[in-house]
Each structure stands twice: as structure tokens, then as C-alpha cells.
From Swiss-Prot:
This is Alpha-endosulfine. Its main location: cytoplasm. Keywords: Acetylation, Cell cycle, Cell division, Cytoplasm, Mitosis, Phosphoprotein, Protein phosphatase inhibitor. The lineage of its organism: Eukaryota, Metazoa, Chordata, Craniata, Vertebrata. It is found in: Cytoplasm. It comes from the Eukaryota. The modification N-acetylserine is found at residue 2. Interacts (when phosphorylated at Ser-67) with PPP2R2D. Interacts with ABCC8. Interacts with SNCA; interaction is disrupted when phosphorylated at Ser-109. Widely expressed with high levels in skeletal muscle and brain and lower levels in the pancreas. Transmembrane segments: none annotated.
Amino acid sequence: MSQKQEEENPAEETGEEKQDTQEKEGILPERAEEAKLKAKYPSLGQKPGGSDFLMKRLQKGQKYFDSGDYNMAKAKMKNKQLPSAGPDKNLVTGDHIPTPQDLPQRKSSLVTSKLAGGQVE
């Protein structure tokens, strides 16, 4: 059994060595391509944040996606200002439940209704 294990181990090592050499060969062409691209386009990949124009636009502050977002933000600002001019909080309501005796008498109407005339035709 030990002979079989020894035979399998060298085969595995050679397979691993082949993979290592393939990876190294695969990396070298990639490095060469990267070097060519960097030589052709030197300004790419230098700034992680992007172009100066993009950075300037991002630093200006909050921007809105469309007019709907702008209008919603504008409405929120108005809603924050409205409660400051709210009603007097000392006013108490609902202490007394009115009864028919407490209500003032209705004023009679100057024009009589044909329905309330009482005449039957």
C-alpha cells in the first residue's frame, strides 16, 4: 500500500506544478496587456474618485434625481415651517356634551317651504 501512495503523490505534485506554471504564464500575458494599456492611456486608473468634473459635482451638495424629488423635498421644508404657527394649546375642547336644552332655539326661516306648508292637495 505504501508503494501506491508514493506513486500517487508524485503524480499530484506534477499536476500542481503544471497548474502553477499555467497560472504564471496566464499572469504574464495579463501583465503585458496592462502595461500596454497603461502606456496607451496614462490618465486611467490614477484617481480612484473619478474625474475632476465628477468630484466637483459631488462636492456641490444634494442633487435631485428629477423634478418630483425636488418638489417632495420642497414640500417637506414647508411642512416643517407650518407647525410653528399652530393653534393655541391652552384651548380646551370637549369638556361639555351639549343637550337639546343647552342648544339655542332655531330661527324661523323667512321663506316658507312648500313641503312644510301643511296643505294637502
